[in-house]
Amino acid sequence: SWDEEIFQSSRLSLYKEAVIKLKESGRLYACYDTREELDLMRRRLLSAGKPPIYDRRGLHLGDAERIKLESTGRIPHWRFLLDGNPAKWGDLIRGDQEYNTNNISDPVLIREDGSYLYTLPSVVDDISCGVTHIIRGEDHVTNTAVQIQIFEALGNVKKQILFAHLPLLTDRGGDGLSKRLGSLSVKDLKESGL
């Protein structure tokens, strides 16, 4: 049961422990690509008719190459190494699911400035808070596949958590409702009597 508010800013030491574990196990690697380099790589892949999947060049850098990049002022961002195995789970809405993680890039978990993207703190918090159900929109199926691999890399058994992916809410025109676009909110629905 929920009985307290959790602030991620007070849990940074837990995230740091997870980062150390992922680095030690070889599942977190430094990348020095700039946004411009990544955009160029993405455009080249797309123009060749290939999916824009990161080529893991950061994974293959040697110590001398890393030192050289850092001496020019480059600061790494950190990517999680997906293991290429399909992520599988029983979805409470969609039934048995399998997602091929070879179809996506290794996700960035830590930005150049050292701040965390949503993915890592979310998994660490789910584990430490004993979350049992994750219910979200079906547009997050890819995130689930990634998070399952992070759960496993941190030594957590994914069966502890049940996933449910709901169809997205749409307006009458079929466009998805979005907070960012100022779409109809639950508050609006409640005020209209629904």
Model-flagged regions — what are they?
Residues A18:
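Conserved N-proximal alpha/beta basic substrate-recognition cap immediately N-terminal to
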